[in-house]
């Protein structure tokens, strides 16, 4: 399982820190007990070029579950950084999928896959992002139209509400979305943590 850790570090800073990156000890999402550090694993992340990054693992002593602690710029199961994926999704919803792929220097098939996953999950994401607005004490904007556009609008409203409450430390829109979905914005078999509640 993966947990998204909201960090202000950029990809380059995180990579340069290596094993010295200061990852906090988190509570187990399953049983809420404190976890202990349980090593690292290497994973590639592409932002223009692919580079190896170390990801911290933590293990719960109570339920024995282990979790990868992904920095907020890293999406679960995706090679590309969330800061690359998110703007491409926005461009695709606007009908510019091929242009988005060309601008990013990525294969069209990669960008098309992101769109397919986002479209498949759009209703669930729209509901979750609207629920986040309510939880943050913000009004839910009028949501109508295609599910993908509704999901983007609800995400924007939730992000603005979070920034009003907590300030710029919330990070940019797509890091916020990645954290809110537990890294599962585009996963195939795993839903965001809030989807079952």
Placement of each model-derived feature along the sequence:
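Intrinsically disordered, low-complexity regions
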Residues: 19, 28, 40, 87, ...
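Short, conserved DNA-binding cores of transcription-related domains
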Residues: 1-74
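Short, positively charged, Gly/Tyr-enriched micro-motifs
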Residues: 59-144
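Feature targets compositionally biased, intrinsically disordered low-complexity regions
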Residues: 9, 17, 38, 47, ...
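Long C-terminal interaction/binding lobes of large macromolecular proteins
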Residues: 1-10, 20, 124-197
């Amino acid at each position: 399982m993966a947990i998204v850790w909201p960090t202000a570090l950029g990809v380059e800073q995180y990579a340069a820190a290596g094993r010295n990156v200061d990852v906090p000890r988190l509570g187990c999402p399953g049983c809420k007990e404190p976890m202990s550090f349980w090593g690292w694993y290497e994973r590639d992340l592409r932002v223009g070029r692919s580079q190896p990054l170390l990801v911290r693992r933590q293990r719960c002593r109570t339920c024995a579950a282990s979790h990868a602690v992904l920095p907020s710029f890293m999406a679960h199961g995706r090679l590309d950084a969330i800061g690359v994926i998110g703007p491409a999704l926005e461009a695709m919803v606007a009908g510019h999928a091929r242009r988005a792929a060309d601008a990013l220097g990525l294969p069209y098939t990669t960008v098309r896959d992101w769109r397919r996953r986002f479209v498949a999950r759009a209703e669930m994401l729209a509901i979750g992002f609207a629920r986040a607005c309510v939880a943050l004490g913000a009004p839910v904007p009028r949501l109508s139209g295609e599910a993908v556009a509704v999901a983007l609008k609800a995400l924007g409203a939730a992000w603005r509400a979070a920034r009003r409450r907590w300030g710029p430390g919330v990070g940019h829109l797509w890091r916020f979305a990645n954290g809110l979905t537990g890294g599962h914005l585009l996963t195939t078999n795993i839903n965001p943590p809030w989807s079952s509640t």
